[in-house]
């Protein structure tokens, strides 16, 4: 039986084939991405640097001496590599279990290609079993929670957690997400919401899944 960590490592290392020399690489956040950062260290001299989606990833990149650049100073970024908490077969994702969803969404949007890396347990038929994170400006927390209840969710404050942007996160359970694009837009239109963890308007372009049989590659249908 292969462990989840083995699957994550396989997928993360497979993403290295998308890394081009002399380019800037977008780097996500989380346990799977940490394996990618470890692999990226071996070719740090051959890339122009990285754009990081969180303070945690920035710290790990700098540990290896990999340059971290400000997105505002970067022109084109061929790829962004990140994990997911769930993916459907259309490569629409739930992300943000680690709390870095807003910066992840920004860096993903700025990249030409989004390569998602995960172990095979993350592939689901319908999104929503994993609680959907919503980043909220603190003063709007109660109002946003009431609006999320109207959408059929059960929001819960992620206690003791503040995002890199100084905001709070509501984790929303009980959503069977049949129309991810529509729900992503609906939630983002609630005043006080910074963004939510649905990556449906900008899904992944490639999904690499670590399985016992090797790395399985899916592209958006």
Curated annotation (Swiss-Prot):
Recorded GO MF terms: ribose-5-phosphate isomerase activity
InterPro entries named among the record's database cross-references: NagB/RpiA_transferase-like (IPR037171), Ribose5P_isomerase_typA_subgr (IPR020672), Ribose5P_isomerase_type_A (IPR004788)
Pathway(s) the chain acts in: Carbohydrate degradation; pentose phosphate pathway; D-ribose 5-phosphate from D-ribulose 5-phosphate (non-oxidative stage): step 1/1
Chain residues that bind substrate: 29-32, 82-85, 95-98, 122
Entry's Gene Ontology cellular component terms: cytosol
Gene Ontology BP term (one): D-ribose metabolic process
Reaction(s) catalysed by this chain's protein: aldehydo-D-ribose 5-phosphate = D-ribulose 5-phosphate
Sorted UniProt keywords: Isomerase
Gene3D superfamilies the UniProt entry points to: 3.30.70.260, 3.40.50.1360
EC number: 5.3.1.6
Active site: 104
Database matches in SUPFAM superfamilies: D-ribose-5-phosphate isomerase (RpiA), lid domain, NagB/RpiA/CoA transferase-like
Subunit description: Homodimer.
HAMAP family: Rib_5P_isom_A
Functional description taken from the UniProt entry: Catalyzes the reversible conversion of ribose-5-phosphate to ribulose 5-phosphate.
Family: Belongs to the ribose 5-phosphate isomerase family.
Annotated protein name in UniProt: Ribose-5-phosphate isomerase A
Record organism: Alkalilimnicola ehrlichii (strain ATCC BAA-1101 / DSM 17681 / MLHE-1)
Gene: rpiA
């Amino acid at each position: 039986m292969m462990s989840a960590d083995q699957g994550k490592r396989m997928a993360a290392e497979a993403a290295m084939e998308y890394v081009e020399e002399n380019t800037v690489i977008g780097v996500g956040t989380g346990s799977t991405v940490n394996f990618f950062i470890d692999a990226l260290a071996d070719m740090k001299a051959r890339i122009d640097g990285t754009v990081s989606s969180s303070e945690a990833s920035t710290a790990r990149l700098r540990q290896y001496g990999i340059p971290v650049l400000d997105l505002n100073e970067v022109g084109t970024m061929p790829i962004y590599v990140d994990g997911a908490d769930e993916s459907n077969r259309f490569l629409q994702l739930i992300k943000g279990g680690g709390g870095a969803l807003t910066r992840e969404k920004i860096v993903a949007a700025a990249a030409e290609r989004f390569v998602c890396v995960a172990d095979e347990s993350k592939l689901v038929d319908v999104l929503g079993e994993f609680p959907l994170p919503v980043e909220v400006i603190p003063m709007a927390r109660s109002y946003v929670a009431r609006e999320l209840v109207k959408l059929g969710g059960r929001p819960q404050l992620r206690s003791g957690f503040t995002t890199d942007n100084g905001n709070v996160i509501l984790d929303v359970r009980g959503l069977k997400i049949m129309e991810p694009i529509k729900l992503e837009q609906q939630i983002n239109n609630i005043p006080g919401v910074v963004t939510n963890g649905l990556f449906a308007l900008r899904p992944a372009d490639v999904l690499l899944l670590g399985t016992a049989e090797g790395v399985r590659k899916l592209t958006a249908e």
